[in-house]
Amino acid sequence: MNARPLSELVDDGWAAALAPVESQVAQMGEFLRAELAAGHRYLPAGPNILRAFTFPLEKVRVLIVGQDPYPTPGHAVGLSFSVAPDVRPLPRSLDNIFKEYRADLGHPAPSNGDLTPWCEQGVMLLNRVLTVRPGTPASHRGKGWEAVTECAIRALVARRQPMVAVLWGRDASTLKPMLEDTAVIESPHPSPLSASRGFFGSKPFSRANELLAQRGAEPVDWRLP
């Protein structure tokens, strides 16, 4: 991750919103360079670390919070839960998300795991921690990314625009106080360990659209190719 100004890396709105933590982003770049110097790799690839912030801040209407990137090489792309179009098989959490997508909306199974079309409609796919050591989940938790992503969430709330936050799992649910009066959909995480405890049947996609409509906002077209 190069030491470049945020204005060269992210959407202009996000560059302004993240200005209070720009020095923290730079420190995380130093942390990642130290990881490489020590013989450790990190995911996702440098250009994708801040990818969630390349979509316009002012257009965000749904926030889906993940924990940290997929630790499997080739999976993490900088958007929570998403993978590149050529990834097979899908990560099991994403496979469960697609099972609920089909059950909730009645759409056919997507042809691949790329969730970029959601981002293009104002769905922000944000991990609380933006990097991970390959093969070691949560390895970069507590290293400093949380200050950056919490600043981002506060910026979303401060807009006072209609937004729905989708919080999957206990880790994501700890953000609820920060969301103030934002509409929130909570359920267990879609991972195989917890999906059957309330993620399946939670209808997050249709419920998000209902909550957006109640607030006078356009619904999301969740259909994926």
Swiss-Prot record:
The EC number(s) given in the record are 3.2.2.27
Q: Name one Pfam family in it.
A: UDG
Q: Which InterPro entries match?
A: UDG_fam1, Ura-DNA_Glyclase_AS, Uracil-DNA_glycosylase-like, Uracil-DNA_glycosylase-like_sf
Give an example GO molecular function: uracil DNA N-glycosylase activity
Instruction: Look up the domain of life of the source.
Output: Bacteria
CC per GO annotation? cytoplasm
Q: Where in the cell is it found?
A: Cytoplasm
List the catalytic activities from the record.
Hydrolyzes single-stranded DNA or mismatched double-stranded DNA and polynucleotides, releasing free uracil
The primary location reported for this protein is cytoplasm
The active site annotation covers: D68 (proton acceptor)
Query: Which SUPFAM superfamilies does this entry report, sorted A to Z?
Result: Uracil-DNA glycosylase-like
Which keywords are on file for this protein? Answer: Cytoplasm, DNA damage, DNA repair, Hydrolase
Q: Which Gene Ontology BP terms does the record give?
A: base-excision repair, AP site formation via deaminated base removal
Query: Which NCBIfam families does this UniProt record tie to the protein?
Result: PRK05254.1-1 (NF003588), PRK05254.1-5 (NF003592), ung (TIGR00628)
Q: Which PANTHER family match?
A: URACIL-DNA GLYCOSYLASE
Purpose: Excises uracil residues from the DNA which can arise as a result of misincorporation of dUMP residues by DNA polymerase or due to deamination of cytosine.
- Family per UniProt? Belongs to the uracil-DNA glycosylase (UDG) superfamily. UNG family.
| Descriptive protein name | Uracil-DNA glycosylase
Q: Which organism is it from?
A: Mycolicibacterium gilvum (strain PYR-GCK) (Mycobacterium gilvum (strain PYR-GCK))
Q: What is the lineage of its organism?
A: Bacteria, Bacillati, Actinomycetota, Actinomycetes, Mycobacteriales
Name the gene for this chain: ung
